[in-house]
A protein has these predicted regions:
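Aromatic-rich peripheral "rim/lid" segments of glycoside hydrolase catalytic domains that contact
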Residues: 186-261
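Extracellular glycoside hydrolase catalytic/binding regions
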Residues: 16, 23, 30, 41-211
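Alpha-helix termination/capping residues and helix-transition junctions
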Residues: 28, 89, 217-220
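A residue-identity detector for tryptophan
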Residues: 4, 32, 46, 106, ...
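An active-site-proximal structural segment forming one wall of the substrate-binding cleft
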Residues: 1-36, 82-84
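Intrinsically disordered, low-complexity regulatory segments enriched
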Residues: 9, 51, 172, 251-253, ...
């Protein structure tokens, strides 16, 4: 159900939550920053992911009227939220805005002098690149990463400090089948229960996509891996071959993720 932005009371509630977080933690040494909202689905992401089909509502009646968030709404939300929490934050804290999966549309946003310590967060996944037509080969991934991830981050770094706040090594090639953009048994797909590649072959694939993606993130101001630990047992649960690549701990243990820096 995606109707939050249509309800002023719910929008105001989120603003008050952000205010309370800023008041409570705004001067804590351990706080780096506050992200105003996670992954607002703008029109492009809504259509690409086919949200209503990918995540079918439990209550269809309640979900009627669900729609993507508009650029106009999210821009106003960010401006209002900034004004409401900035005064509670010490000067070394950051306010983070998510790009809504439209990284390059923010060039004219928050250009005024008053907006300080604003970071632009982008979430980039190879599974979404596959949905955009990226060839499911190491060479295809590298081409897409260079032409899109790297190019766009370098371009937007001129306007904001850019972080890749979510990414991982997951890709359909290593899974051995087209995951249709990272869909699983939870979406009604069978998944894979038998490995397609040897451990050494998988290691080569993952090391390659790790290297190319880290080179792209280096064009910005930093990155955060999606998850340190994945609770799903991908070994003993049917249909989950390849999903251990969402788990940074496993990626390091298996030698897939380089620890050079």
């Amino acid at each position: 159900m995606c109707k939050w932005a249509q309800n002023p009371e719910e929008v105001e509630f989120v603003h008050t939550v952000l205010e309370r977080l800023a008041q409570r933690y705004g001067h804590r040494e351990g706080l780096w920053g506050i992200e105003l909202i996670n992954e607002p689905a703008l029109q492009g992401a809504w259509e690409l992911l086919n949200i209503q089909k990918r995540y079918p509502p439990v209550d269809e009646e309640m979900a009627k009227g669900s729609a993507p968030i508009t650029v106009e709404f999210i821009r106003k939300f960010y401006l209002d939220a900034y004004d409401r929490i900035e005064k509670y934050l010490s000067e070394d804290k950051y306010i983070v805005i998510h790009d809504g999966f439209e990284l390059t549309i923010w060039k004219d946003f928050m250009r005024e002098e008053k907006y300080k310590n604003v970071v632009l967060d982008t979430h980039q996944y190879l599974m979404m690149a596959e949905m955009m037509g990226c060839e499911q080969t190491v060479e295809g991934y590298e081409k897409y990463v260079k032409e899109h991830f790297m190019k766009e981050i370098e371009e937007m770094q001129q306007y904001f400090p850019v972080i890749c706040g979510e990414w991982c090594l997951f890709n359909s090639l290593a899974c051995g089948w087209d995951t249709k953009g990272g869909q699983t048994v939870l979406n009604g797909l069978e998944g894979a229960s038998v490995e397609t590649y040897t451990p050494e072959q998988k290691k080569e694939i993952y090391q390659a996509v790790a290297k190319m993606q880290k080179e792209a993130w280096d064009k910005g101001s930093g990155y955060f891996y999606w998850s340190y630990k994945l609770l799903t047992d991908t070994v003993n649960t049917d249909g989950w071959v390849g999903w251990d690549s969402w788990d940074l701990g496993r990626c390091v243990d298996f030698g897939w993720f380089p620890l050079d820096k």
